[in-house]
Amino acid sequence: MKKFLGFIAVLVLLCACSTQGDKQAKSGADSMEEVTVKYATGFSVRDSADIRLVDVGKKDHFALVHDEATVAPEGYVKVKVPIERTICMTSLQLSNFTILDAHDVVKGITGTKNLFNEDIKARVKDGRIVKIGMEGEFDPEVVMAANPDVIFISPSKRGGYDAIKEIGITLVPHLGYKELDPLGQAEWIKFIGMFIGKEKEAAEIFAGIESRYNELKEKAAKVEQRPTVTSGEMHYGNWHAVGGKNYLAQIFRDAGADYVINDDETSGEDLEFEKMYALSANADYWRILNSYQGDFSYEALKASEPRNEMFKAFKEKKVIYCNMKQTPYYEIAPVKPDVLLKDFVAIFHPELVEKDYQPTFYRLLQ
């Protein structure tokens, strides 16, 4: 009898351990990697039980869950994660998926006109990724065929999202383009990571970006001489001037230079040539980003606007240039602000980088 009772006790203990183990395993499977947001201002994260609450801007709220049966709090749109299929609307969004090695999740994009990424182009060619059309002209049937779990949208674009809403697909705003801090924009890889189950990978990748960026920023902060820099060029009678409260102006500051509109509190505005010249005539450097067909040159810059030769930076051959026809700027730069920063530091303060450094985006115009 004692032996029998002993056997029962052992059996009960084993069952209890097994049940506890199952609970722990289930808890581990359902748990979400912690996400900390340090620089980005466009989204915030709160974890509650088995629900992750993600607020995007002031109007959009999402409850990320592993179990479809989980009830989302009032005011939150439930999204079962990890998602397996999505559509990207911008190169910035696509850059997040690229750096996370998650092209398999992307089932649709707007188009391939200015696309550089060979893997994405191959997927479009063989049908794994479809082209849904440009903003305002989306093809609802193609969107439905892509069968996305969610669609990441950019409110800055022309829209056309109402037709997609009617299909019943969850639209998730991606506000990375609004970030004023370069690291804040890059941190949106954590946002995408939460939706595709790559929180850990996103955190590790971002930590590397952050470390490299801040290390170089600290070196540049110690320079004794800070050159001045202006940005942009004339288009259709106006010069779109980046404001002092802007992503690019912040990069200039972090690279050890002073932007000519450093005290402005706007992100950007269109100015007449005369006003921009008054601000920029004596700037040491002049940054230009465009999509010139062919090899851009000082001759081409003068041909586009004869008065350009009046700038000090033009005369001294200190124009900093990137051609988007030749460089996948918007496909890479949003998630590599550390590289972008290094390009500028290499020009402003070459002694702070290795002598054989080869720029990725910007270089002095020849």
Regions found by a protein language model. Name each.
Residues 52, 63-144, 150-152:
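A short, structured surface patch at a secondary-structure boundary
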Residues 102, 167-170, 255, 315:
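Short, structured coil segments at secondary-structure junctions
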